[in-house]
């Protein structure tokens, strides 16, 4: 058995930072899509956050590794301004709401299946009180997508103490369909999500890729 290698705290920090791409040399010229793809291939996930102080959260990891870069190039790769069916990243739940390479979508289908097994309490309430709503929202997206939550025509409820998001039932239905993979984000305008059928957003070769088994 080989001897155990010991690292100091400083060495361990440097290893961790290098693994995340911080040791790579920055481009000397204009940053383009090739450089951004290199970062995305390395880190695989860009967390999305609605909080906007300095800049939107998903722009910052790329900036930290490349320095100034054209944000519209990242937008194009993420699908926010990509041609339908050609985004290189898509939105879904990883450790949090994130942008993820489209090629990893099959690896997240286990989580999409879980939406049927473990529905949210709000969805159980809707299924009991308004069972037609989910089908109505599905049809609305099919006929008119991409749509915003506001396009469901359901008003936002009065603010409730302790409830951060205060979603109306139309938004809950869309987010549930998003969780189960039936819809995805087609674009964002002023950071507002537009939902459309996943089959109209993601590349067909991704959608037709086999689903790994639970053991895999």
Model-derived segments and spans:
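Long, low-complexity intrinsically disordered regions
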Residues: 1-216
């Amino acid at each position: 058995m080989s001897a155990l290698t010991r690292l100091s705290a400083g060495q361990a920090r440097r290893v961790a930072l290098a693994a995340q791409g911080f040791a790579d040399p920055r481009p000397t010229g204009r940053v383009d899509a090739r450089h951004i793809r290199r970062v995305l291939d390395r880190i695989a996930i860009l967390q999305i956050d609605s909080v906007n102080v300095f800049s939107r959260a998903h722009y910052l990891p790329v900036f930290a590794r490349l320095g100034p870069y054209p944000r519209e190039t990242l937008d194009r790769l993420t699908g926010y301004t990509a041609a339908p069916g050609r985004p290189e990243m898509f939105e879904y739940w990883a450790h949090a709401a994130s942008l993820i390479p489209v090629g990893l979508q099959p690896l997240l289908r286990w989580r999409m299946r879980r939406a049927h097994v473990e529905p949210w309490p709000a969805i159980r309430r809707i299924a009991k009180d308004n069972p037609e709503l989910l089908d109505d929202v599905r049809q609305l997206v099919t006929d008119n997508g991409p749509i915003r939550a506001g396009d469901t025509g359901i008003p936002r409820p009065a603010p409730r103490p302790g409830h951060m998001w205060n979603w109306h039932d139309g938004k809950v239905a869309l987010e549930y369909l998003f969780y189960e993979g039936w819809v995805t984000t087609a674009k964002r305008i002023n950071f507002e999500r537009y939902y459309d059928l996943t089959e109209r957003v993601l590349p067909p070769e991704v959608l037709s890729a086999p689903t790994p088994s639970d053991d895999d």
